[in-house]
Swiss-Prot record:
UniProt organism field: Human immunodeficiency virus type 1 group M subtype B (isolate JRCSF) (HIV-1)
Name of the featured protein: Gag polyprotein
SMART domains for the chain: ZnF_C2HC
Free-text domain note: Late-budding domains (L domains) are short sequence motifs essential for viral particle budding. They recruit proteins of the host ESCRT machinery (Endosomal Sorting Complex Required for Transport) or ESCRT-associated proteins. p6-gag contains two L domains: a PTAP/PSAP motif, which interacts with the UEV domain of TSG101 and a LYPX(n)L motif which interacts with PDCD6IP/AIP1.
Residue window of motif PTAP/PSAP motif: 455-458
Keywords associated with the record: AIDS, Capsid protein, Host cell membrane, Host cytoplasm, Host endosome, Host membrane, Host nucleus, Host-virus interaction, Lipoprotein, Membrane, Metal-binding, Methylation, Myristate, Phosphoprotein, Repeat, RNA-binding, Viral budding, Viral budding via the host ESCRT complexes, Viral nucleoprotein, Viral release from host cell, Virion, Zinc, Zinc-finger
Residue ranges annotated as motif LYPX(n)L motif: 487-496
Compositionally skewed regions (Basic and acidic residues) per UniProt: 476-487
Gene3D superfamilies recorded: 1.10.1200.30, 6.10.250.390, Human Immunodeficiency Virus Type 1 Capsid Protein, Immunodeficiency lentiviruses, gag gene matrix protein p17, Single helix bin, Zinc finger, CCHC-type
Phosphoserine modification, residue list: 148
Amino acid sequence: MGARASVLSGGELDRWEKIRLRPGGKKKYRLKHIVWASRELERFAVNPGLLESSEGCRQILGQLQPSLKTGSEELTSLYNTVATLYCVHQRIEIKDTKEALEKIEEEQTKSMKKAQQAAADTGNSSQVSQNYPIVQNLQGQMVHQAISPRTLNAWVKVIEEKAFSPEVIPMFSALSEGATPQDLNTMLNTVGGHQAAMQMLKETINEEAAEWDRLHPVHAGPIAPGQMREPRGSDIAGTTSTLQEQIGWMTNNPPIPVGEIYKRWIILGLNKIVRMYSPVSILDIRQGPKEPFRDYVDRFYKTLRAEQATQEVKNWMTETLLVQNANPDCKTILKALGPAATLEEMMTACQGVGGPGHKARVLAEAMSQVTNPATIMMQRGNFRNQRKNVKCFNCGKEGHIARNCRAPRKKGCWKCGKEGHQMKECTERQANFLGKIWPSYKGRPGNFLQSRPEPTAPPEESFRFGEETATPSQKQEQKQEPIDKELYPLTSLRSLFGNDPSSQ
């Protein structure tokens, strides 16, 4: 950390920490951004010590700028950080990153005009190529510098560690900037393993070379003196062309960028290989219930790199699928932010979602909303929200129940008005075992014990002084009663059900 922190002096560090990340934003540059930029440069096999001077920052910008259109968001952030650091070294007054990029663009435009003017003054209208590894020596000749072992080592290390994951493509693009077809073949030949993938890459290159030959047929007739022959597909692939021919095509007027053409073919084949090594579709990337949003975004963009689609389609996937495939907690937050939210705002808003702190906040908000019994009834499914008017059994008034009644307690049953029992023991209008209401005028229902108390007064016959002659039918009934009492005692079924109404 100490070596990286020495990039800026005291006064430069003060100016650095006053620059805003975005126009009108609150966040400003800090020392951690320089540390992050140093680590990213080490990943791309670039010396982080170049950040200590404005000239070193200019060299880094020259290498990163051609990859901005096809690079990832991390590459764009790295370019913006180095551009801002360059302005600090040059003591250029800026307020935010946008102004730094504008200053860089102005300087590049001025330098380009100066180079064109110098070329016009010397009678050479062609622009001087400064792309590595083709450089101009002191005699003005275009010479080739072989690709460095350090670059090859970085490329081999990436293949060994990452195999053919999506980040291999931008790494290859950065390491092969300005390379000739011979340099590109050297990089491909250093790959020892993964021969199946390399065979697929060769097939893709052969297909693209055949397509080039079909679209660019050879012109009939001899070649004019002083002119070079037109490259064929095999010449672009470096199999039938020499290094001097490749340099001549790349520096000719007008130039034929055989190195860039061959590089596009290789990247096209690498995309197919990455697709084979990463069979997961972007549609299958979904956030787990307890997965942090940051890890989900990392998986999403890693899979998005492997998608063979245009930048417009990838932008649509990012705007739509990133929110759609998030878990319910994060999706609620992201929809509340709106469609214009940046990735930084999304990650800040969803930070900590799924953890114990977030669950406690959600529970507290839910409990704070439930403040009255009506809300609880709504949550339990009682959507009628209608309260029945209660009636007191004691006084007969509405608005309260008998438990809270202030009137004197009424004696007897609150249902039938009779004394001797309570309302819960009342049998008035009670259904029998058949589910029918027993009429009150018939006495106790049939499903109750038919307890008939014996009369205490003497029978009517004892008050009569003269005996009346009984009819034969009355005698028969008197004989039948003792028999019934013997056959059907009080505890029998007949005493339970009484006289059967259906037999009467």
